[in-house]
Structure formats: C-alpha cells, structure tokens
C-alpha cells in the first residue's frame, strides 16, 4: 500500500513561488528551450519536498534533467489529460531514487524487476524506489539497495549522475499514464570487486528476479541501442552473444546465460511488455560511462 505521505516534486522558475508539480505537467520542457527533452537544472530536498529550479539555492546541486522524446506526459493531448481519473490527475509527481553500484573493477549492478510488480515488470533497472519523508537521497538509495538486494553499503563515495522524467506506461500507445516520477540516479563506488559483492547478494524475490554485472564495453553497446532510434535493438559494434546473469530460483541465485538481444530490446509500441533495459537506465549508464577516465589516444603510437 502506498504511503499516505509522499515526497513530491515542487518547481520554481525565475524566482516564482514554489509550487507542487502537476501530474500532467511536462517538467523537462518547463526548463528547456522550445519544450526540449533535456535541461540543466538545480535540485535538492527541502522540508520533504524535492525542489527543481532554474537557479541555485541553498544545498542544491546542478544536474542534467532528461526525458525520452516519446514521453507520455510530453505527448499527452488535452483530451487525454481530461480523461485521466481524478485520483491520477491530482496525485502530483513522485520522487524516485536509483543507485548504480560500481565495483572496484568498474562493473555496475542491474536488477530485473519481478514479473508480479505493477510498474515496469520484468524490466532491468538499478536498485531503487521512493524517497520516504525525512530521508536524504543517498539514505533512501542505500535503503532501497539493502531491501532489494541485501547489499549493505556505508561510507561509500557517491555522486548524483542525473535526473530522468519517467512515466508508466512508457508509451501512450500502451495506455494513459498512471505514474509520473522524477528519478534521481546516484552512483556509489564500492572498494570491492563485483565477485565479492556478488557473494553478498540476497535479493528479495518479491521485487527482484535476477541480477547482472555490466562492464563498460557491454554498457556502451546498450547505450547505443536507443529506444526511439530506427535501428534500435541491434548491436552498434562488437558485442557478446550472451551475458551471464544470476536468476533467483526458489530463493537461490543460479547462473545462466541470457541473449545479448534481450538487453538491446526496446519497449514495444503495443502489446505485452518485454524483458529489456529501461530507457532511463540507458540514460544512467551513459552518464556513468562519462564519469570514467577516457582511454588514452592511440593516434601517435
């Protein structure tokens, strides 16, 4: 059951009064030129509100906010907005937090959401969830990481990667939106290898059905398979045929190989959801890759 008290997104622009974001309001477009799909904003938690502003404010951080071109909220017509049930139209915009755990050998953890979940079932994402009242972003992210995977991380270096405007269903062709979030992607860096972290995994099968560690080369292939590109779902260069994942079967993790094509799949325009990496996760992976040292140039070798 949803908490009666939720941390909601509030907006201010050009020193206007702070107002709660409306469910049908395209937030990214509010801060970008010509209703575009990315914007540089300032954000932070303030008295159980997640504030987004075009200007710096105390304890805020500058960060990129982005949405997909096919964002349902962006493309919602006035008629469709009016057709939303009152409890949806008046629920505001929730705040989510997702944690990319980076091992010391430069791999990141993704989890596959359980098929039984109502939102984004069977989709690969970083561990995460809602921010509870009174929590800071990192505190919420580490709590969700612990609850979903069993990993307990404390005192780890971290940074905010970026914000993603998310809606579910992810495409208007799949139905009118019932959820609208601003997802905060955090990067936390462990001093352990992915093998050491893997041994500590104890996923909650109510939320997680599998785990995978991605290296930088696989992440690059996944990022290249954009969800709204004409050639999406096809490898953009050398890619392995399969990826080793850990599936949760009868309470225990079991190793198996999944086709690389699964991780390059995109959201179907109609019909049942398919196993895939979420569009927001691809965005987070692209931001993660940008944090890594660039390989030295070979031009003069």
From Swiss-Prot:
One of its GO terms (molecular function) is hydrolase activity. A motif (Nudix box) lies at residues 129-150. InterPro entries: NAD-cap_RNA_hydrolase_NudC, Nudix_hydrolase, NUDIX_hydrolase-like_dom_sf, NUDIX_hydrolase_dom, Nudt17_dom. It is an enzyme of class 3 (hydrolase). Keywords: Hydrolase, Magnesium, Manganese, Metal-binding. Residues 90-236 form the Nudix hydrolase domain. It catalyses: a 5'-end (N(7)-methyl 5'-triphosphoguanosine)-ribonucleoside in mRNA + H2O = N(7)-methyl-GDP + a 5'-end phospho-ribonucleoside in mRNA + 2 H(+). SUPFAM superfamilies: Nudix (SSF55811). The keyword Magnesium applies. Mg(2+) binds at residues 144, 148. PROSITE patterns: NUDIX. The keyword DNA-binding does not apply. Its cofactor is Mg(2+); Mn(2+). Its EC number is 3.6.1.62. Belongs to the Nudix hydrolase family. Acts as a decapping enzyme capable of hydrolyzing monomethylated capped RNAs (in vitro). Hydrolyzes monomethylated capped RNA after alpha and beta phosphates to form N(7)-methyl-GDP. Shows low activity towards unmethylated capped RNA. This is m7GpppN-mRNA hydrolase NUDT17. The lineage of its organism: Eukaryota, Metazoa, Chordata, Craniata, Vertebrata. The gene is nudt17.
